[in-house]
Each structure stands twice: as structure tokens, then as C-alpha cells.
């Protein structure tokens, strides 16, 4: 049935516009019609997710060309077009975006107490911009949506954040990411004036001198490194996570952290191959420092969200090591780990959100002995804790294994230090689980709170299925991205 219908639903611009259409519909509905707003938002987000699956169904694994390409004239007096398409690298990021959005909306309806309609509109706009980022094949269009994502996220953190410092965290998030991206804008303008185009496919055939590649690479790095984030521009992330609502943390960890690493893969590495080789030792150094530093910092944290936030920094810098190994195994492993992190970290933030909804605190010392009062939660939390420490059979293990294989081929010392980071990751993951679920039982504090209800368990089920699926049968994902990754490596002559 899906195969028959798929040819009629393979329009990327329609996928981008669908969440915006949903936001326009609920915009005109009165705030008092809560059930109608909830129904429209949930169904719109689910339809968007199903719509994105049609692109996977129709995707041709054996071609490195961009598929479902659309070109719309944007600026008539210049060679800048609304140019979109997807390949094996971007496909799953689009699906991950549409997968997480309905979950965020469902969580928000029960956790957000004010401005619910505006909350849904903000998430729909954010989803639309994120899909456009992953589909953009024009540098300027990419930049526009890359920066536009900041607006709904700024509002989500600043309006629906959980504590008094939410405004400061929102401004910190906005300014850090915006200031870094100004350098990328200058680089894009330079490229346009030098080549007369911002079309990615044309630019991939354009050879820049080594000196220009280095300068342009640095400009793009200034933007993407903040989004990863890499040390020392990671300060905004823990604060943003702590202050953001649960659903905001899910989108932030699940999707927004992938924008920087995706930017490296889509633009920096293929457009500036000589500069990429030149700066690879620099990236390795920063990544190893970030993995070890943030892992040790995580062990010292007392806030549940900060623990997961710092672990996200470590995982994303593990991704950059695999990506800059510049071989097929490392890059495919980095993509898999990004997808896995999008599932595992999102689920962990949902676990923290479930505790916060009941106990109104995220401080570790107030928890202990939850296994006796919340056995279902304890089991689910254990599963995602094990996935976070890359237990074999889970999605994270496959990604990190391929990254280590690729990194050993490029630099065995870096791979060894990255493996040390995995050990530290296991240490803080088990420490966290032991303190929260076992430890000293605090009856006066937690006895009156209930276990997860049916709705909350159903929210976790898709994450469990995804983590097991990627961990047990990763070939489904690898075969889609392999041709595109191979073409990337061959194009840069990295072999």
C-alpha cells in the first residue's frame, strides 16, 4: 500500500510546509478549544512523520546523487535558488526530526501549563526549519534556516523554561550560536562574490586554493563548532538544557546538536578537502580534550539534566573524531552515533522530566531507592543508561565501534584516548543510575509518588524499538548511507 502511494507523496517542499500549515490552522483556533488544538497538533505531527517515511521507501541506495531535488527561483537577479534535496547522509536526520516532534508535542500538552497553543506553534515552526536545514543544497538557504532555528528555540527556552534563570540561558544560547555563525555568513558572501553562486553541487566542482580553503574552513568551523559543541564554546549547552522544558531539551539534544556535525559533513569536508586534512590534528586534539574533560566534569555534577548535557558534549565530540577519520567506517559510525544519540539522550531527558514532574527537583541527592516505588521507571531508565554507555546490542555500540575502527586507521593514539572516554562514560552512567534508583531510600520524599503511567510508557516504546533496531540490525541504516559516504571520501581523495 505504501509503495503504491509513495510516488504521490515525495515532495520535499510539502514536507517542509506541512508543519507550518499545522501552525497556521491552530493559530486561528480559540485558546479555549484545547481538545481540538491537541488533536490537530498530534495528527499533523504524526502525518508529517509518516510523510517523511515515504522518502525512505522511495530512496535509491545505489546512487550518490541527491534525490527528490526541487529548485525554485529565489532571487531573480542572482544565481541563488531555493534548492533542496536529500541523500544518504541527510535522509535519517529528516526522519529523526519528524520522529521527535510528535513526542515533544505530546509531552508538552501534559507538562506545559500556560500558552499551550503558542507552544505547539513554536515546535511546528522549529520542525519546519530543521527539515529545511537538512534538505538545503544552497549555502545561503542553508544559512537562513540554520539561523532561523534559533528563534523558536529561544522562545521555547525563554517562555517555557523551568527556572528563574531561563531568560539568561535563552540569551546565552542565542548569542553564542549567532555570533559564531556570522563568520560563516561572511564566508558565504566571499564564496558568492568569487564564484557567482551558492549552489552546493557547483561549489563541489570548484577548486579553491589551499590558502582560501584554510580561511573559509576556519569561518565555517567557527559556526559549526558552537553547535556541536566543542570545547571551549560548550558553556551555553548545560545552562540551556537545565533551563529548557523537557521537550525543549529533547529537541536540543536530539536534533540541534546535530546541526554542527551535519554542517561539517555536508559543507566543510567536501568543499575544503585540503583544509580538512590540514586541520584534522586540531580537531582530534579538541575532541579528545572535550571527551575526557566533560566526562570528568559529568561525574562532579549534582543536577540530573547537567549530567546528561555534559555526556552529550562527550558523545558529540566522539562523533567528530569518527567524522574526521575521513574514511568510510569512521564517517558511517559518526552518522549512526548521531542518530543513536538523538534517541538515547532524548529518552534520558524524558526520564528526568518524568522525575521532575513528580518531585519538582533535579538534584541527585534528593533521590534514592526509586526501584521500590517506581519499578517500571527504574527498568526503562536502566535500559537507556546501558544504551548511553554503549552496551553491545544497543545503537550506541555500533556507532562507537565503527568510529574506533575508523580512528585507529587514522591515528591509534586518538582512538585509544577516545576509548578511555568510553570507560569514563560507563563510570558516570552507572554512578548516576546507582544514586537515583538504588542508594538510600527516602520515604518522606518519594513514597507518595506513583510509577510511570500508560501514556508515559507508550512514549518510551518508540525509543526502545529504535535503539534495539539500530543495535541489532544496523545494516538497514548503513546501506542507505554507504554510497553517499563512499562518494564523500572519494571526492575528497581521503583514501
From Swiss-Prot:
It comes from the Eukaryota. The chain crosses the membrane at residues 9-29, 37-57, 89-109, 118-138, 139-159, 173-193, 214-234, 245-265, 272-292, 307-327, 335-355, 367-387, 413-433, 457-477. It catalyses: a ubiquinone + NADH + 5 H(+)(in) = a ubiquinol + NAD(+) + 4 H(+)(out). It is a multi-pass membrane protein. Disulfide bonds: none annotated. GO terms for molecular function: NADH dehydrogenase (ubiquinone) activity. Its EC number is 7.1.1.2. It is found in: Mitochondrion membrane. Its main location: mitochondrion. Keywords: Electron transport, Membrane, Mitochondrion, NAD, Respiratory chain, Translocase, Transmembrane, Transmembrane helix, Transport, Ubiquinone. InterPro entries: NADH_Q_OxRdtase_chainM/4, NADH_UbQ_OxRdtase, ND/Mrp_TM. It is an enzyme of class 7 (translocase). It holds the Pfam family Proton_antipo_M. GO terms for cellular component: mitochondrial membrane. GO terms for biological process: ATP synthesis coupled electron transport. Core subunit of the mitochondrial membrane respiratory chain NADH dehydrogenase (Complex I) that is believed to belong to the minimal assembly required for catalysis. Complex I functions in the transfer of electrons from NADH to the respiratory chain. The immediate electron acceptor for the enzyme is believed to be ubiquinone. Belongs to the complex I subunit 4 family. This is NADH-ubiquinone oxidoreductase chain 4. It comes from Marchantia polymorpha.
Amino acid at each position: 500500500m505504501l509503495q503504491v502511494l509513495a510516488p504521490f507523496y515525495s515532495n520535499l517542499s510539502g514536507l517542509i510546509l506541512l508543519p507550518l500549515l499545522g501552525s497556521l490552522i491552530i493559530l486561528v483556533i480559540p485558546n479555549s478549544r484545547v481538545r481540538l488544538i491537541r488533536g490537530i497538533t498530534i495528527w499533523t505531527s504524526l502525518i508529517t512523520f509518516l510523510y517523511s517515511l515515504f522518502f525512505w521507501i522511495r530512496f535509491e541506495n545505489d546512487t550518490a546523487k541527491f534525490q527528490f531535488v526541487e529548485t525554485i527561483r529565489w532571487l531573480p537577479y542572482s544565481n541563488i535558488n531555493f534548492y533542496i534535496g536529500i541523500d544518504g547522509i541527510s535522509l535519517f536526520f529528516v526522519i529523526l526530526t519528524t520522529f521527535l516532534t510528535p513526542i515533544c508535542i505530546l509531552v508538552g500538552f501534559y507538562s506545559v501549563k500556560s500558552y499551550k497553543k503558542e507552544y505547539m506553534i513554536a515546535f511546528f515552526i522549529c520542525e519546519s526549519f530543521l527539515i529545511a536545514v537538512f534538505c538545503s543544497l544552497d549555502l545561503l538557504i542553508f544559512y537562513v534556516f540554520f539561523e532561523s532555528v534559533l528563534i523558536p528555540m529561544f522562545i521555547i527556552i525563554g517562555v517555557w523554561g523551568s527556572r528563574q534563570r531561563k531568560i539568561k540561558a535563552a540569551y546565552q544560547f542565542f548569542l553564542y550560536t549567532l555570533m559564531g555563525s556570522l563568520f560563516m555568513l561572511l564566508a558565504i558572501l566571499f564564496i558568492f562574490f568569487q564564484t557567482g553562486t551558492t549552489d552546493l553541487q557547483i561549489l563541489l566542482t570548484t577548486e579553491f586554493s589551499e590558502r582560501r580553503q584554510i580561511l573559509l574552513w576556519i569561518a565555517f568551523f567557527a559556526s559549526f563548532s558552537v553547535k556541536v559543541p566543542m570545547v571551549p564554546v560548550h558553556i551555553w549547552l548545560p545552562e540551556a538544557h537545565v533551563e529548557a522544558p523537557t521537550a525543549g531539551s529533547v529537541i536540543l539534544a536530539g536534533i540541534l546538536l546535530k546541526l554542527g556535525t551535519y554542517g561539517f559533513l555536508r559543507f566543510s569536508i567536501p568543499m575544503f578537502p585540503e583544509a580538512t586534512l590540514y586541520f584534522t590534528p586540531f580537531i582530534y586534539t579538541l575532541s579528545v580534550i572535550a571527551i575526557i574533560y566533560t566526562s570528568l566534569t559529568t561525574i562532579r555534577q549534582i543536577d540530573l539534566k547537567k549530567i546528561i548535557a555534559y555526556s552529550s558534549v562527550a558523545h558529540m565530540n566522539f562523533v567528530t573524531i569518527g567524522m574526521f577519520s575521513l574514511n568510510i567506517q569512521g564517517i558511517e559510525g559518526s552518522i549512526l552515533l548521531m542518530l543513536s544519540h538523538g534517541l538515547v539522550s532524548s529518552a534520558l531527558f524524558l526520564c528526568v522530566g518524568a522525575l521532575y514532574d513528580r518531585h519538582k527537583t533535579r538534584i541527585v541527592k534528593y533521590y534514592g531507592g526509586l526501584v521500590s516505588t517506581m519499578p517500571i521507571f527504574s527498568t526503562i531508565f536502566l535500559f537507556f543508561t546501558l544504551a548511553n554507555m554503549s552496551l553491545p546490542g544497543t545503537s550506541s555500540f555500533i556507532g562507537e565501534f565503527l568510529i574506533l575502527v575508523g580512528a585507529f586507521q587514522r591515528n591509534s593514539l586518538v582512538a585509544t584516548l577516545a576509548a578511555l572516554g568510553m570507560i569514563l562514560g560507563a563510570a558516570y552512567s552507572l554512578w548516576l543510575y546507582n544514586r537515583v534508583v538504588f542508594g538510600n531510600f527516602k520515604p518522606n520524599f518519594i513514597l507518595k509518588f506513583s510509577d510511570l503511567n500508560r501514556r508515559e510508557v507508550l512514549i518510551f516504546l518508540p525509543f526502545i524499538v529504535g535503539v534495539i533496531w539500530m543495535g541489532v540490525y544496523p545494516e538497514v541504516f548503513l546501506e542507505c548511507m554507504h554510497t553517499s559516504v563512499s562518494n564523500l571520501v572519494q571526492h575528497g581523495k581521503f583514501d
